[in-house]
Amino acid sequence: YGSMRDLVLGLTVVLPDGEVIRTGGRARKSAAGYDLTRLFIGSEGTLGVITELTLRLFGQPECAQSAMCSFASMQAATATVVDALRYGLCLNRIELADSVQMNAINRHTQSELVEKPTLFLELTGSKPGVEHDLAVLEGLIQDNGALAFERAQTQEQTNRIWRIRHSALYASRSSSVRSRTLS
C-alpha cells in the first residue's frame, strides 16, 4: 500500500514554540506551496510533535493468493517483476531473496528450497481479478524461465511461504557471528 508518507492525508502538529498547525486536506495534489504533511512525516518528529493523523485506509481484499518462484538469475527474477508491474497486476507484496539468502534460509530452517533468486508474491483483490492476474503472472513466470513455482492452495501453504520469507532475517543473522541487524 506504499510507505507511511503515502498514507498520511493530513496531520496536526505542535511546533517547538507551542503553535498548533494543521496540514493536508482532501485534495490529492495542490500547488499552494510546500507539502507540509510530507515534510513533517519525513522529519520523524524533529520539527514538531504530531498529535493527530488523518490516514488513508484500505478495506480487506476479498481474495488473496500467495506464491513463490525461483529463477536461474536475478535478471530473470527482476524481469518478472517489471513485467508484472507493466501488466498492472494486483500485486500486494513482492519480495526477492537472492541465492545467498536462499542458502542461508535452507541452513537456518533445514529446508531444501532451490538456492536461486526467489520471488515471494501475493496478489489481492476480487476473486475473479486475482484468478485472472494469477494466470497472467504464471505465464510471465514461465516466459522468464522459472526453475520452480509454488502456488499456495491452502492457508497452511500460504503461511509456509511467508514463514520462509520471514525467516530470512534470522537466517542472515545466524550465518555470521559478526552480523548485525540495522533498522
Regions found by a protein language model. Name each.
Residues 1-183:
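Noncatalytic alpha-helical scaffold of FAD-dependent oxidoreductases
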